[in-house]
Amino acid sequence: MSESNHPVIEFDHVSKIYPNGVVGLKDIDLTINQGEFVVVVGLSGAGKSTLMRAINRLHDISEGDVRIDGVSITKAKGKKLLNIRRKIGMIFQSFNLVNRSSVLKNVLTGRVGYYPTWKMVLGLFSAEDKQRAYDALRTVELEDKVYTRADQLSGGQQQRVAIARALTQTPTIILADEPIASLDPQTTKRVMDDLRRINQEMGITVVANLHSVEVAQAYATRIIGIRAGQKVFDGPVAEATDEIIASIYSGNEQEVS
């Protein structure tokens, strides 16, 4: 599926200042459209993870507004906030799986926002949602691991289970916060290929934080450079020249992400 001009993520003069006075984000204006594959790059502590976590409000911002599909997640509360977050799948560097549970049970937790707590505890998922989980595992080519315990999988397989979990959520957006940081090159390619296929074939908007500029240039349609909490570059991959990349990574930022 191709990109559209429909904005799914909007930052309107967004700033984040931590209680200790450290500036996480400074006056960020940003629009990401449906179907884009955006990679955010910058030094550790530049604010990449802060930006990512502002999208689904894992971090509250200090100023400005963040909108998802035109609706303010900054101002949302209760059920309205839950409904917005249902649209946003999240993949973490640390996988965040329940090691002693099966792959299937882990993937089904992607439906947590659709069930009352007691049904989740008892594992009372509908046949339709179980099919969603199987389909998601098929997408990442792990359908043969349905009943395998998560802690019996390799790191790359665990990250692909995390991708399947995000897919089971039926999101319009997937956020990937350093998804390949602990993976070897071969496994990195597998995970990034999965994300690109999901983006291209399903039309799901992908926003990823990556340390590797080479991987970013290989997979992104657009690169955003963050330095000291500020957006210093935003454009197509072809415009991210060596000089621009060097400027994004210049300086010595304090850890804030």
Swiss-Prot record:
* Reaction(s) catalysed (UniProt annotation): phosphonate(out) + ATP + H2O = phosphonate(in) + ADP + phosphate + H(+)
Q: What class of enzyme is it?
A: translocase
Q: Which UniProt keywords apply?
A: ATP-binding, Cell membrane, Membrane, Nucleotide-binding, Phosphonate transport, Translocase, Transport
Q: Which GO terms describe its cellular component?
A: plasma membrane
The GO molecular function terms of this record are: ABC-type phosphonate transporter activity; ATP binding; ATP hydrolysis activity
Q: Does the keyword Ribonucleoprotein apply?
A: no
Keyword Cell membrane belongs to the record: yes
Matching PROSITE patterns:
ABC_TRANSPORTER_1 (PS00211), ABC_TRANSPORTER_2 (PS50893), PHNC (PS51249)
Q: What is its main location?
A: membrane
Please indicate which superkingdom the organism of origin belongs to: Bacteria
SMART domains from the UniProt entry: AAA
InterPro entries with a match to the protein in the record:
AAA+_ATPase, ABC_transporter-like_ATP-bd, ABC_transporter-like_CS, ABC_transpr_PhnC, MetN_ABC_transporter-like, P-loop_NTPase
In what way does this protein cross or attach to the membrane?
Peripheral membrane protein
The segment(s) forming the ABC transporter domain are: 9-253
Residues at which ATP binds = G42, L43, S44, G45, A46, G47, K48, S49
- Which cellular compartments is it found in? Cell membrane
Per the UniProt entry, the Enzyme Commission number(s) are 7.3.2.2
- Classification via Gene3D superfamilies: P-loop containing nucleotide triphosphate hydrolases
Instruction: Identify its protein family.
Output: Belongs to the ABC transporter superfamily. Phosphonates importer (TC 3.A.1.9.1) family.
Tell me how this protein assembles: The complex is composed of two ATP-binding proteins (PhnC), two transmembrane proteins (PhnE) and a solute-binding protein (PhnD).
**Briefly, what is this protein's role?**
Part of the ABC transporter complex PhnCDE involved in phosphonates import. Responsible for energy coupling to the transport system.
NCBIfam families according to UniProt: ABC_phnC
Could you identify this protein by its name? Phosphonates import ATP-binding protein PhnC
The major lineage groups are:
Bacteria, Bacillati, Bacillota, Bacilli, Lactobacillales
Gene for this protein?
phnC
